[in-house]
């Protein structure tokens, strides 16, 4: 693999890792390169992002991990995007992600990914932007991934007084909600949204 291909792989890995970021150890293992090669690739990618006004991303190093982030210069536009009222309902992926977080909180994105079997960075960003989920600290250890929990807005949106009002599972630590429980969960959300519109 040549240098340009390595940069493409690196960028893909950083994107897929989301806000959990990647350590140089993870990069060396996944890309099968040396520590020095990983640092050189990270520096080259960072220079490309920083050296070009037409790029919307930067490479950050936080708590020993590297992650992609948006440029501060674009903050005004990102804020507008979040503030624009959205009449769209949550996607199935977002609803499933929300149910997993509700039942297993506090939970990391990687744990949610494992339950759903697919990457959930997008749905989690949507849920955070809509105020249904927030991060509440980080796990100890390598990577220091964010822990996600539901908010009081989540309780309001689903007409719940507390998390104890969620449909019961046999064992929330191991069981996933069955389809009937998920339907009840989503029906409560849709009913509360219809009441808001009246």
From Swiss-Prot:
Protein encoded by which gene: scpB
Listed GO CC annotations: cytoplasm
Record keywords, A-Z: Cell cycle, Cell division, Chromosome partition, Cytoplasm
Alphabetical list of InterPro entries matching this protein: ScpB_csome_segregation, WH-like_DNA-bd_sf, WH_DNA-bd_sf
Organism of derivation: Listeria monocytogenes serotype 4b (strain CLIP80459)
Quaternary structure and partners: Homodimer. Homodimerization may be required to stabilize the binding of ScpA to the Smc head domains. Component of a cohesin-like complex composed of ScpA, ScpB and the Smc homodimer, in which ScpA and ScpB bind to the head domain of Smc. The presence of the three proteins is required for the association of the complex with DNA.
Region ranges (Disordered): 168-198
Protein name (database record): Segregation and condensation protein B
Function as written in the Swiss-Prot or TrEMBL entry: Participates in chromosomal partition during cell division. May act via the formation of a condensin-like complex containing Smc and ScpA that pull DNA away from mid-cell into both cell halves.
Subcellular location: Cytoplasm
Recorded family membership: Belongs to the ScpB family.
Matches recorded under NCBIfam families: SMC-Scp complex subunit ScpB
Pfam families xrefs: SMC_ScpB
GO biological process: cell division; chromosome separation; DNA replication
Main location: cytoplasm
